Structures are given as structure tokens and as C-alpha cells.
């Protein structure tokens, strides 16, 4: 990848290893900055180099602890604006609060994704780069440009999962994920598609009801954007095995893996879970033999390079 001289890469505390790998792909280094905490827990951030007139790319996922990482992002953005950076691009591989993107019927709740978008714009971010945004329409909450990287296809192609399977079938874990699953199936050798029809009786609980499609003697690959408690995946895997699937693998971009997720995965019919490094794996997940993590550093670096060189980003994902 060509050297990009006029940009600077910085990061918060959410995912420094990903930021370092992105910088290496761009043949550059991480900018000098201090991020720490005051004695009362408030965030302290200071830029330790001249960034006047520079194009800043600030890499910061907003996963657990979500509120801490969101606040870091906001304060860092304000610091770069006050330091007269020419542009400030927020590179947020995992966009926290994305699942709170609408009011459900008459619920008296905030639209939290919109609140985060408003804060980012208020402090002066110029652009957002994110990965497999939970809902594409969240881009409409922003007045600034948003580049949503579609990582699923690239990640599965690089891992060559489908090449290892003789009769693969892409599976959507719910009706809402059909568009994503269909796009992946089309790009990956026009693989067949199955759908899990499920009902969710309570938050963070999923009950599989029906499998739409013949999965008998097939190697199934469930694709989703987020794996949180893993309830959806585990129920889906059981349903697929009951219908005669030979193996069940899964690809999920964002490994939130909260609560008993790792235990649920180990005790389930899932043979392998492939995730990316948009969120660092905690210790239990990193040791889990069923979980494989692949890096998106090259894809993110390519996106940054294209933006910097004023080249198309969308062409990376077109047939």
C-alpha cells in the first residue's frame, strides 16, 4: 500500500492493536497523544504533536465499556478541532448504540444512535468510517459523509471458509438479516440461502421457530453483524442440526460476546465462529477453541488510503 504522508493516525483506548496494524498497512506510525484518567475518573486527552492542517484519522470502536469509549471519542474529536486539524475522520469499526436506532411503536425511549451522531457532529468530525453498520439507515442520522465498510464478504473470502466446504449454504439468523445474507451468498459463488424464522420473547433472548430452506446434508454458514449473548446463533445452530445440517459455522463481524456468550458457544452445536478485530477479544473468548478472529486492518487501511487519494470506496464492494 502506498505511503500516505499527509495523514496522521491516532487512537483511543478501545482498540490500540487494530490502530497499530492499520498504521503499519499505511506505512506510517501512530501519532503522539496522551490518554489517561484523572483521579476522579474523568478522561484526560492531550495531543503531543503539531496537527495544524493535517488530515486526522481517529480509530476508536465504541464497544464495552461503551460509555467510556464514546466519551473518549467525543473529547478527542474536540481536541483535534481546537488544534486546527484540516479534517477529522472518526474511524469507528464497531459503532456502539447502533441497535438503538428507532422508537419501538409508542415506547418512551431515546433514539440513542441519533444522539451519538449529533454529539460527533457537534464536536467537529468531518467524516465517519464504520464497519458493517447494524442498520444502513443510521447513515441518515449524519450530515457528514459516512463510509460503511462491508466487511463480511471480504473477511469470508480471505478466510476461504467456503472453499473448505463441499456443499456450503449461507444462512440468515433472522428475517431482518436476509438482505445481508443474500448479498454474501451472491458474491460467494452464488451459494444457496436459508433463513431462520425466529421470535424473540424478551430482550437478549431468541427462540428459533422454523428453518426456511432445505439444509439436509449441507455445510451451513450463519452470517450476522453482531454476536452478543450468542443466543440467536446457538438456537439457530441447533435448529439447523435438527434439520440435518452436517456442520454449522458462523461469521459475525463484531464480537461483543457479553455475559455467558463464550460458554453458550462452547455448549452449542456451532462448530466454528469467525469474528473480526473490530472489538478486541476478552481473555475467555481468546482462549475459546471454537472462536477464530481475523483482522480487518488491511481493509480499513485501504479505505483510508482511498479517501485520502480521493478514490472511490464503494467500488471495493461492487461486483
Swiss-Prot record:
Cofactors named for this entry: Mg(2+)
Location in the cell: Cytoplasm
This protein's UniProt keywords: ATP-binding, Cytoplasm, Kinase, Magnesium, Metal-binding, Nucleotide biosynthesis, Nucleotide-binding, Transferase
One MF annotation (Gene Ontology) recorded for this entry: ribose phosphate diphosphokinase activity
A Pfam family it matches: Pribosyltran_N
Chain sites annotated for binding ATP: 40-42, 99-100
Record-listed E.C. numbers: 2.7.6.1
Residues that bind Mg(2+) 1: 134
Pathway recorded for this protein: Metabolic intermediate biosynthesis; 5-phospho-alpha-D-ribose 1-diphosphate biosynthesis; 5-phospho-alpha-D-ribose 1-diphosphate from D-ribose 5-phosphate (route I): step 1/1
Binding site for D-ribose 5-phosphate: 200, 224, 228-232
Secreted recorded as keyword: no
UniProt entry tagged with the keyword DNA repair: no
Primary residence: cytoplasm
Recorded GO CC terms: cytoplasm; ribose phosphate diphosphokinase complex
Entry annotation: catalytic residues: 198
Subunit structure: Homohexamer.
Family, similarity comment: Belongs to the ribose-phosphate pyrophosphokinase family. Class I subfamily.
Protein name: Ribose-phosphate pyrophosphokinase
Annotated organism of origin: Coxiella burnetii (strain RSA 493 / Nine Mile phase I)
Amino acid at each position: 500500500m502506498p505511503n500516505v504522508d499527509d495523514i496522521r493516525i491516532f487512537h483511543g483506548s478501545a482498540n490500540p492493536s487494530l490502530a497499530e496494524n492499520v498504521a503499519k498497512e499505511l506505512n506510517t506510525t501512530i501519532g503522539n497523544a496522551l490518554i489517561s484518567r484523572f483521579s476522579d475518573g474523568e478522561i484526560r486527552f492531550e495531543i503531543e504533536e503539531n496537527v495544524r492542517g493535517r488530515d486526522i484519522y481517529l480509530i476508536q470502536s465504541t464497544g464495552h465499556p461503551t460509555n467510556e469509549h464514546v466519551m473518549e471519542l467525543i473529547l478527542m474529536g474536540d481536541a483535534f478541532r481546537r488544534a486546527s486539524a484540516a479534517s477529522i475522520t472518526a474511524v469507528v469499526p464497531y459503532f456502539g448504540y447502533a441497535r438503538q436506532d428507532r422508537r419501538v411503536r409508542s415506547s418512551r425511549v431515546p433514539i440513542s444512535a441519533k444522539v451519538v451522531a449529533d454529539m460527533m457532529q457537534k464536536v467537529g468530525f468531518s467524516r465517519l468510517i464504520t464497519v458493517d453498520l447494524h442498520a444502513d439507515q443510521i447513515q441518515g442520522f449524519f450530515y457528514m459523509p459516512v463510509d460503511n465498510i462491508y466487511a463480511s464478504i471480504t473477511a469470508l473470502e480471505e478466510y476461504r471458509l467456503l472453499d473448505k466446504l463441499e456443499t456450503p449454504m449461507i444462512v440468515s439468523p433472522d428475517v431482518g438479516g436476509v438482505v445481508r445474507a443474500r448479498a454474501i451468498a451472491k458474491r460467494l459463488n452464488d451459494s444457496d440461502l436459508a433463513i431462520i424464522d425466529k421470535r424473540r420473547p424478551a430482550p437478549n433472548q431468541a427462540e428459533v421457530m422454523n428453518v426456511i430452506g432445505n439444509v439436509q446434508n449441507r455445510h451451513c454458514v450463519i452470517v450476522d453483524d453482531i454476536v452478543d449473548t450468542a443466543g440467536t446463533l446457538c438456537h439457530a445452530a441447533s435448529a439447523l442440526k435438527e434439520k440435518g445440517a452436517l456442520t454449522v459455522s458462523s461469521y459475525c463481524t463484531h464480537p461483543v460476546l457479553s455475559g455467558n456468550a463464550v460458554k453458550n458457544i462452547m455448549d452449542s452445536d456451532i462448530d466454528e465462529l469467525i469474528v473480526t478485530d473490530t472489538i478486541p477479544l476478552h481473555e475467555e473468548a481468546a482462549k475459546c477453541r471454537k472462536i477464530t478472529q481475523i483482522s480487518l486492518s488491511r481493509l480499513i487501511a485501504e479505505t483510508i488510503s482511498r479517501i485520502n487519494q480521493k478514490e472511490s470506496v464503494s467500488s471495493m464492494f461492487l461486483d
